[in-house]
Amino acid sequence: MDDDGFRNWGYYEPAAASSFKGNLGLQLMSTIDRNTKPFLPGRESNLMIGSNGSYHSREQDMNYSWINQPKDNKFFNMLPISTPSYSNVLSETSGSNSIQMIHQPVLNSSRFEENPIPPPAPCEEQTGKKRKMRGSIATPTVPKAKKMRKPKEERDVTNNNVQQQQQRVKPVKKSVDLVINGVSMDISGLPVPVCTCTGTPQQCYRWGCGGWQSACCTTNISVYPLPMSTKRRGARISGRKMSQGAFKKVLEKLSTEGYSFGNAIDLKSHWARHGTNKFVTIR
């Protein structure tokens, strides 16, 4: 003991071990007709008990204890202690009663799964299809009524009728009335004027609104037909031209002379002297 009268940690009473032999406080279960299972599967049930009914203790048991030393110098020491023998108790109980292990029911493993594996996320294509299906279910589309088409025979008949009507209807000639010397004259009925610069009369081309253009002469050359233009592909050199106002003056001059307008007018001596318009195409 210490100076204060307390027991030390290393104090050992051999008599204390013998006191456990009398009463261990074990409550053994009565034998019941149950399926007895060994404590360790795959081995003998009486593993702890040998063939002679005695308990096989370990070869060497070590107890860690503190040895009473001065307060200034304490160290950790190991002392071998003989373990109490329970051979008498186990031999008595092994003959009459066997230790029964209560079989506990297997708990549901789902309770212990704290972090279950989450299901795979749905693909974007599947979600898009689901959305389309939901939209189609929510708002059903009403089928549009198909337009009735006419049969081919009726269409052909109607097209032929339209074409015949278009062919029958002729465009009405526009009347161009000019007041010449106080007399209204329709120049649209006059014959096409000609030009005799090459020695033979050649009809002129219409130019502008009521004007005319020569097809055989320019200020430099007089030939029929006029040569092709080098600047404009597929067009000829433009001949001399006369506007509607200039042609009206020619008609006034000829009417004073008493010219008969039933004959074609020769424009050889009535062309302008300022040249030609090269951008006019002769066809």
Curated annotation (Swiss-Prot):
Domain of life, per lineage: Eukaryota
Entry GO MF terms: cis-regulatory region sequence-specific DNA binding; DNA binding; sequence-specific DNA binding; sequence-specific double-stranded DNA binding
Pfam families according to UniProt: GAGA_bind
Keywords per UniProt: DNA-binding, Nucleus, Transcription, Transcription regulation
A GO biological process held by the record: positive regulation of response to salt stress
CC per GO annotation: nucleus
Record region (Disordered): 111-170
Main location: nucleus
Compositional bias of kind Low complexity: 158-169
Family per record: Belongs to the BBR/BPC family.
Protein name: Protein BASIC PENTACYSTEINE1
